[in-house]
Design a protein with these regions (language model features):
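Specific transmembrane alpha-helical segments of multi-pass solute transporters/efflux pumps
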Residues: 39-44, 71-123, 157-160, 240-258
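Cytoplasmic-side transmembrane-helix entry/capping segments in multi-pass membrane proteins
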Residues: 30-33, 85-95, 141-153, 171-175, ...
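Specific alpha-helical transmembrane segments that line the substrate/conduction pathway
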Residues: 57-68, 99-100, 104-141, 146, ...
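C-terminal-most transmembrane helix of multi-pass membrane proteins
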Residues: 2-19, 63, 220, 232-234, ...
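Glycine-/small-residue-enriched transmembrane alpha-helix faces in small-molecule transporters
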Residues: 1-61, 66, 105, 109, ...
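Hydrophobic transmembrane alpha-helices of multi-pass small-molecule transport proteins
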Residues: 38, 70, 93, 125, ...
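Membrane-interface helix-cap regions at the ends of transmembrane helices
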Residues: 42-48, 53, 66-84, 105, ...
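Helix-helix packing/entry segments at the starts of transmembrane helices
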Residues: 33, 37, 61, 118-126, ...
Length: 314
């Protein structure tokens, strides 16, 4: 990016075209990421319906269905799904293992030791890590404004969700959730260039489906699928379509266009979407502290997403 600016600098029209193109790419990437986070945040109420279901079996079905949908989408749109090479298997398996499998296991098993808000704050803290580690993986220096925006956004998200209560084990689960959420984005950086958003999503979902199928058979029994109610099937279907097939492609499209650092800022939209969805579903009106948190999140997004200072090449 730095080199492109240097080449364009001598010609004013070139500079204008570059800035216009960069702003357009930033806008499209931001919209893609925002839509992904709205899907994720809006799914909170749906996820709660699976609390008493055989969760590993449901997750296996979710990712299997999402993978089939993604393959159909790739075929219709002419998007190639390439076979991973050598080290790419490690990156893709790492995404599936951490961001999809361990993340969901931590949420399910950690619910006994921590309130949902604890995990929400853990996820809300990820943008600060992405703002630093993302550019380094992309062989750039972190942008100070993005790092500052990530800190502001994390504070705002904490106000929106509250801190919650947990025991010592709960803090451990929260740390696992934090690491897995970061890995979901960071481990994709080396493979997005060759596989694209659709390819990465296809490979990670089928790997996760296989792992959850094994977990479900071992921990819940091969007949667990018969215990899923109609509501469980509907919730699983929604998660497969909206929160996996659609959200994954939108999110990785965002990461490819904005970079992991700035894309991470958009995770702040998820708790806002969750709060507003709760209100729409006849939940209580947000308290003043929540509205203050929403304002802080918006300020963080405005500071970090707008086109301007970006990471510089190492």
């Amino acid at each position: 990016m730095t080199a492109n600016r240097a080449l364009a600098a001598p010609v004013s029209t070139g500079t204008g075209a570059y800035r216009s193109g960069a702003a357009w790419a930033t806008g499209r990437g931001a919209v893609a990421g925002a839509l992904a986070m709205v899907c994720v945040g809006g799914s909170v109420a749906v996820t709660g319906t699976l609390a008493k279901a055989p969760v590993y079996t449901a997750e296996g079905l979710r990712y299997a269905a999402a993978c089939l949908l993604l393959l159909a989408f790739a075929r219709v749109c002419g998007r190639p799904v390439r076979l991973p090479r050598a080290a790419e298997w490690l990156w893709l398996s790492g995404i599936a293992a951490t961001g999809l499998v361990v993340f969901n296991v931590a949420l399910a098993d950690g619910a006994r030791d921590a309130e949902p808000a604890v995990f929400g704050v853990a996820v809300a803290s990820v943008p600060a890590l992405l703002a630093v580690a993302g550019p380094l993986l992309e062989r750039s220096r972190p942008a100070p404004r993005t790092v500052l925006a990530a800190v502001v956004l994390t504070c705002g998200a904490a106000l929106v969700q509250g801190l919650g209560r947990c025991n010592a084990a709960g803090y451990g689960w929260a740390a696992v959730v934090f690491g897995c959420e970061a890995a979901f984005t960071l481990l994709a950086v080396p493979v997005l260039g060759r596989h694209g958003a659709v390819g990465v999503s296809v490979h990670t979902t089928w790997i996760a489906a296989v792992v959850f199928a094994v977990l479900g058979a071992v921990r819940e029994g091969p007949a667990a699928v018969a215990r899923l109610s109609a509501a469980d099937w509907l919730a699983t279907g929604y998660l497969a379509v909206g929160v996996t097939a659609v959200a994954f492609v939108r999110w990785y499209t965002c990461v490819g266009r904005l970079g992991a650092g700035r894309a991470g800022l958009l995770t702040g939209i998820a708790p806002i979407a969750a709060t507003l969805t709760g209100v729409l579903l006849s939940g209580p009106a947000p308290r003043p502290m929540v509205w203050a948190g929403i304002a802080v999140v918006i300020a963080g997004l405005a500071l970090g997403i707008r086109n301007g200072e970006g990471p510089s090449t190492l």
